């Protein structure tokens, strides 16, 4: 009888590949992502954006100057060619999410590393940049109680982990006035874990089953960009930009483990009675999405900048895990800007940068015949700190809030209402820049 019930448990487990968002309750766990949608693809994508850019909706392709100064824009490496000072930029990230499904809700919160980047000018040769950025996060936990005749069981799924990207980039001005190009060479690395469990909490005679899948992702990637800068007179300027990626492939070392524990309680807390480990697959390749972004910004000196981006990413070549629907195309738009009331004013609040933006994305995920959309408004401040070294050092504290929603309660899906807080710090200085004496 136990063998028959064990086969029942495994058949329930193996039938749950795509049940994820059909579960009646969703809960988050301690990761940097609290999204049930992060189980698809490589997780919830973080993008190569600073808090300054996020507060302006995520504009990136055409962003070259901000507040009259060159900005470190990893999303378009052509911008490195504009740097005239060494730039350090780092941040932390916080997330507050309300998950809703049907009439039930759950609240989560977490804080994590944002990014750390450096930019160094190389005089007429252009500029280079290097750093470490988060690439994606996985973090979800959901369960459903069901009956099989008189037998009651709980089916649950959970995942955690994330990918990071270390990069080195170079941008250079071309002989054609105003035109620049650049590229980033990156190394992607990290671990993603997904777990499916079937538990029989009220029956100690039936074994609980756990299936754990680990993905170890490693590999090199390349992205590139181009910008055209033009002065419009009266201290106004315009930058048109494009950035994209190649058909990057990275390696996926995949391993699976099946575990049997005693019933009558939590499978994760019980002692394992038996374990089956599958051989590690070393030769799997993951196709990263092909991306194309175009954007434009218009600026007036230190006073203001406005911009817009169109973003496209094709995930249809991404190999999904067994039981999951194929991914599609991610299409998005971003609008935003920055305003400084009076750069020469002695009043402090007149020299603060005020930022506002909005974005809308049709994501690559379609579930229950409905596209999952993501939309948000954002706002932030660039708070200047005291200048030192006779005006050669400019430091700024960047605070950004994103207020958005992903998904919907319709079509039996999960709705996420979230607040993302980004706290960043920027230093512009003359490190590594050789001075001259007249």
Predicted regions and their residues:
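Subset of outer-membrane beta-barrel
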Residues: 29-438
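Cleavable N-terminal export/targeting peptides
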Residues: 1-40, 432-438
């Amino acid at each position: 009888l136990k063998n028959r019930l064990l086969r029942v448990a495994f058949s329930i487990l193996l039938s749950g590949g795509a049940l994820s968002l059909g579960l009646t309750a969703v809960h988050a766990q301690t990761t940097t992502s609290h999204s049930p949608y992060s189980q698809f693809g490589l997780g919830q994508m973080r993008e190569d954006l600073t808090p300054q850019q996020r507060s302006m909706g995520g504009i990136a392709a055409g962003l070259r100057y901000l507040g009259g100064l060159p900005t470190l824009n990893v999303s378009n490496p052509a911008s490195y060619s504009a740097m005239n000072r060494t730039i350090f930029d780092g941040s932390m990230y916080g997330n507050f999410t309300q998950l809703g499904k049907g009439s039930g809700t759950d609240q989560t919160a977490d804080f994590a590393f944002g990014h750390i980047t450096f930019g160094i000018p190389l005089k007429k040769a252009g500029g280079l940049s290097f750093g470490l950025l988060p690439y994606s996060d996985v973090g979800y936990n959901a369960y459903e109680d069901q009956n099989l005749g008189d037998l009651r069981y709980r089916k649950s799924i959970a995942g955690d982990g994330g990918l990071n990207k270390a990069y080195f980039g170079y941008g250079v001005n071309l002989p054609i006035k105003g035109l620049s190009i650049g590229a980033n060479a990156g190394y992607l690395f990290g671990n993603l874990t997904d777990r499916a469990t079937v538990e029989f909490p009220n029956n100690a005679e039936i074994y609980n089953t756990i299936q754990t899948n680990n993905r170890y992702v490693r590999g090199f990637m390349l992205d590139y960009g181009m910008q055209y800068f033009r002065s419009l007179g009266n201290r106004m300027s315009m930058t048109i930009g494009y950035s994209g990626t190649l058909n990057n492939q990275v390696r996926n070392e995949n391993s699976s483990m099946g575990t049997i524990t005693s019933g009558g309680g939590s499978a994760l807390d019980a002692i394992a009675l038996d374990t089956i480990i599958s051989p590690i697959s070393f030769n799997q390749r993951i196709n990263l999405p092909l991306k194309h972004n175009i954007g434009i910004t218009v600026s007036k000196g230190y006073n203001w900048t406005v911009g817009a981006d169109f973003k496209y990413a094709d995930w249809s070549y991404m190999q999904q895990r067994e039981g999951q629907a194929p991914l599609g195309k991610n299409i998005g738009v971003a609008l935003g800007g920055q305003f400084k009331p009076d750069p020469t004013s002695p009043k402090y609040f007149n020299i603060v940068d005020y930022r506002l933006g909005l974005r809308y994305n049709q994501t690559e995920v379609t579930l229950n015949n409905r596209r999952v959309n993501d939309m948000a408004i954002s706002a932030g401040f660039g708070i200047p700190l005291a200048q030192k070294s006779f005006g050669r050092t400019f430091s700024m504290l960047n605070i950004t809030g994103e207020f958005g929603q992903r998904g919907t309660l319709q079509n039996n899906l999960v709705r996420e209402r979230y607040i993302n807080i980004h706290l960043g710090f920027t230093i512009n200085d003359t490190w590594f820049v050789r001075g001259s004496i007249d």
